[in-house]
């Protein structure tokens, strides 16, 4: 993804197996690193004691005394009908972004195809597709922060997505819904089913799916001029 027409300071932080790329107007390196490490450790500790949380492809129930980030992941993934494993990366991205948004008005956090974007202006995203073409979509101006999950296909199967972007109220939900889309695409009439699914998941704003020569759009996602 490429953010167009925006100037800001860019840096990256490494937390174990995660690399977060951050754009912000001010110096928030140390705050970003501390927040990312804190959220990662919460998830890592919980996952060690509850390995199903990191490996299940289906919704998992968690106890009421679990850390807030764990409960939020479980609830969000269940809303999309998938397992919490698909929202882990987006959760850290989300929570770091929300933490920084308390200090700065404009911030983007990117981790492996998951994006938290808070901006007072509309942003244009370049959504890539295999084998190299692209389309630009719009992320509306927002004060709370929105999530985007993007996937670039890499296989020859007819049911395998060539490119995918989901825009949602959170990065966690975008990642979970993107996983749901890819699962549905393997079924008969998969593209139609995937677009219907995106319209039905509460909190998903919209999505675009590239499947072979076909392009499908759902929800309120807007193509950029």
Regions found by a protein language model. Give the residues of each.
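Conserved mixed alpha/beta catalytic, RNA-binding, or beta-rich assembly cores of soluble enzyme
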Residues: 71-82, 86-96, 100, 104-194, ...
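N-terminal basic/disordered segments at the start of proteins
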Residues: 1-28
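Flexible, glycine/charged-enriched surface loops at secondary-structure junctions
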Residues: 48-61, 105-107, 112, 187-218
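Catalytic cores of large soluble enzymes that bind and process phosphate-bearing ligands
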Residues: 27-31, 35, 61, 65, ...
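Short, ordered loop/turn segments at secondary-structure junctions
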Residues: 25-27, 113-114, 171, 212-213
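An interfacial alpha-helical scaffold signature
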Residues: 39-49, 59-82, 132
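Conserved short hydrophobic interaction patches
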Residues: 39-42, 46, 180-184, 197
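Conserved phosphate-binding loops in N-terminal lobes of ATP-dependent enzymes
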Residues: 19-52
């Amino acid at each position: 993804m490429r953010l167009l027409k925006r100037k800001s300071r860019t840096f990256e932080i490494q937390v174990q197996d995660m690399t977060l790329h951050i754009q912000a107007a001010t110096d928030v390196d140390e705050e970003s690193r501390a927040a990312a490490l804190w959220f990662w450790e919460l998830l890592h500790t919980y996952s060690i004691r509850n390995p199903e949380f990191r490996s299940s492809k289906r919704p998992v129930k968690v106890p009421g005394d679990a850390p807030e980030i764990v409960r939020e992941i479980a609830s969000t993934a269940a809303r999309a009908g998938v397992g919490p494993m698909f929202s882990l990366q987006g959760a850290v991205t989300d929570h770091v972004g929300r933490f920084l948004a308390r200090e700065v008005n404009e911030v983007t956090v990117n981790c492996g195809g998951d994006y938290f974007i808070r901006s007072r202006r509309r942003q244009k995203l370049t959504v890539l597709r295999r084998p190299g073409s692209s389309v630009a979509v719009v992320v509306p101006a927002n004060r709370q922060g929105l999530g985007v999950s993007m996937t670039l296909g890499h296989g020859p199967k007819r049911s395998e997505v060539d490119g995918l972007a989901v825009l949602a109220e959170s990065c966690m939900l975008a990642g979970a819904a993107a996983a749901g889309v890819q699962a549905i695409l393997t079924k008969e009439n998969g593209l139609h089913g995937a677009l219907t699914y995106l319209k039905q998941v509460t909190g998903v704003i919209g999505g675009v799916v590239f499947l072979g020569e076909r392009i499908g759009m759902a929800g309120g996602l807007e193509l950029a001029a």
